[in-house]
Amino acid sequence: MAVSVSKQYMTSLVVILLFISLSSLSPTSTSHSCDPVEEEEEASSFGYVCHSNLQKCHTFAILRAKPPFYSLSDLSRHLGLDADDEYVPKGQLLLIPIECRCNGSIYEASLIKNCVKGDTFRSVSQSLQGLTTCLSIREKNPHISEDKLGDNIKLRLAIRCSCPQEGVSNASFLVTYPVGVRDSVSSLAVRFNTTEDAIVSANNKSGVVPLKPALIPLDHKPEKQGSRKRNPSKKKRSKMKLMIAVSSAIAGVCGLVTLMVFGYLHWKKETQIQTQTQKWISNKDPETRQLSLSIRTTSDKKISFEGSQDGSILDSHNTVGTTTPRKPVLEIYAFEELEKATENFSSSNHIKGSVYFGSLKGKDLAIKQVNADEMKRFDFGLLNDQSHYYNHNVIRVLGTCFREIDQDSYLVFEYARNGSLWDWIQNKLAIKNQFIESCYCFLAWKQRIKICHDVAIALKYMHRINYVHGNIKSRNIFLNEDLRGKVGNFGMSKCVTNELATEENLIESSLSPASDIFAYGIIVMEVLSGQTPDMLLGLQEVETTSLGTQETFVSEWSRLRRLLGDKEKLREVMDSTLGESYSVDSAFEIASIARDCTAEEAESRPSAVEIAERVSRLVDDDEDEEDEAVIDRESTLISESSYKPLVKKSSIID
């Protein structure tokens, strides 16, 4: 009896201890992305303690041009900065003016971050490259749940900064700079035209720490190269105002009659367009009819907006205002406008297939003719997300032109000046005779890596909104004037009617995010080798009904994937035009990504998020190496971009 009770007691005790152990291992619902261990250092160790003689100052912070901050407009959109006050060296460093204030005992500058879907406290801090910390963001926003970050959420940020101490430093500005892995005190002194002693003194007699901010002392205000001063004298301003007033009066009198006449003609034309459009929409499906609620004619602004859910945003003083955030909608063009833009759809403006080049109001466009069935199957619902309009890596749909039921309609896309990726890696530009003869049309290794990164970012965006592209290939990757990649055919996955076998549907038949990933792996192979997979395998395009060819393809494909996993044999498939001007380690990592993406089992392939992170690390490594080269030949903050458009016209939809 006693033995039985003892066994029951021991069994219960073991169960209780096991429960407690498992409970301690399980994650809590209040977990955050911040890691306190990584940010345990005090701000004072980096020289940010307030000085009693200076409570605030105007200074600057620096960001490197990388996602999500590519340009001036990115900073203005994400951080709410005034575009006219930003100093942006294209492709190099972004210089941000800030007001540094003493908050308690520590200097900091306040900014507001406009969140997007997928943001976390950690991702925001990482995007700012050490100017703030994950824990600081969480402390400054105690009432905002990290799990609910998304569009229209405003985060308050405390940017690290400092003011020069009178009598101690001769510097007029202490610029906050994110230290890179390859930065050193000596290299920073050369880049910013200062001394090593001044940098060490400004940072509490210590050196610089990679991936942490450092203070760079400058004795003058950084200025944009070639900038023009905008400080005319009072006399000049008065004269300018008088000239404007006189010109306005004359223009008003002379244009009154003209305005009345053309106003009537324009109203009549607009009425005809809207009547024709509504007639077309009334015969379509409910989703297309819903789009009519967002349609504006060309007499309106390029971007119109609709209200958000909360109906409030922060104004310039960071207070809640009544202005309603809005979403971009499509523009509707009259058929006569497209005729004029394309010179009556002349052969000289024909790009390929049903796509024409057009120029309207000084803007280059790609205009695609589509039949009624294609227009009906176009996924207009994707365009309701404002992130589509601001996405740098997707060819944007700008507008439409609806015609009669029995006539073809048109989709209007942004125009990519430098053709498709296929044109470049297959060296077809010479055949098209659309390149500048003095230029050698060739993609360098670093440019190829950046294009792979751009496509990965586009896939990450599309899969985040649960959209499967279904037609990812080098012919549908286009290059803008800066040779950055943009994915075409967005919204047309239901319009694809290709009957020929492709590499991915020889292995699997259903469309899914994994099939897009497979297609991405094929593009990476083309970038590496300068050849199509068919050329690498020694095969030709065949009909999908050929079972023997399918078995041969799968066998040869497995052999090619094994080749990508061998660093020595990889040289055999590298594009010969690259010569030795590429990193073997970088090429092997890209080949590994291609190999992982084309795994036979869909569940074994990485996600678009994983791919973007892996390629991003390669881009960062290349940029760090390039920074070292820039230091040797430049001593200023700002340099001009050397990229030039090489192609006159390019297709948007293949």
UniProtKB/Swiss-Prot annotation:
Query: Can you say where the LysM repeats lie in this chain?
Result: 177-217
Q: Which cysteines are joined by disulfide bonds?
A: C50-C102, C57-C163, C100-C161
Name recorded for this polypeptide: Protein LYK2
Q: Per UniProt, what is one Pfam family of this protein?
A: PK_Tyr_Ser-Thr
Tell me where in this chain the Protein kinase domain is found: 324-619
| Topology of the protein relative to the lipid bilayer | Single-pass membrane protein
Hey, which stretches end up on the Cytoplasmic side? Answer: 263-654
Family (UniProt): Belongs to the protein kinase superfamily. Ser/Thr protein kinase family.
Q: Name one GO molecular function term.
A: ATP binding
**Keyword Cytoplasm included in the entry's annotation:** no
Positions annotated to bind ATP: L330, E331, I332, Y333, A334, F335, E336, E337, L338, K368
Recorded hits in InterPro entries, A to Z, give: Kinase-like_dom_sf (IPR011009), LysM_dom (IPR018392), Plant_RLK_LysM (IPR052611), Prot_kinase_dom (IPR000719), Ser-Thr/Tyr_kinase_cat_dom (IPR001245)
Ranges of the Extracellular topological domain: 26-241
Give the signal peptide as a residue range, or say none if absent.
1-25
Q: Please spell out the taxonomic lineage of the organism that makes this protein.
A: Eukaryota, Viridiplantae, Streptophyta, Embryophyta, Tracheophyta
Q: Note the Gene3D superfamilies from the entry.
A: Phosphorylase Kinase, domain 1, Transferase(Phosphotransferase) domain 1
Transmembrane stretches in the record are: 242-262
Question: Which residues are sugar-modified?
Answer: N103, N170, N193, N204
Q: What does this protein do?
A: May recognize microbe-derived N-acetylglucosamine (NAG)-containing ligands.
Query: What spans are recorded as compositionally biased (Basic residues)?
Result: 227-238
Task: Report the domain remarks.
Answer: The protein kinase domain is predicted to be catalytically inactive.
Keywords from UniProt, A to Z, are:
ATP-binding, Cell membrane, Disulfide bond, Glycoprotein, Membrane, Nucleotide-binding, Repeat, Signal, Transferase, Transmembrane, Transmembrane helix
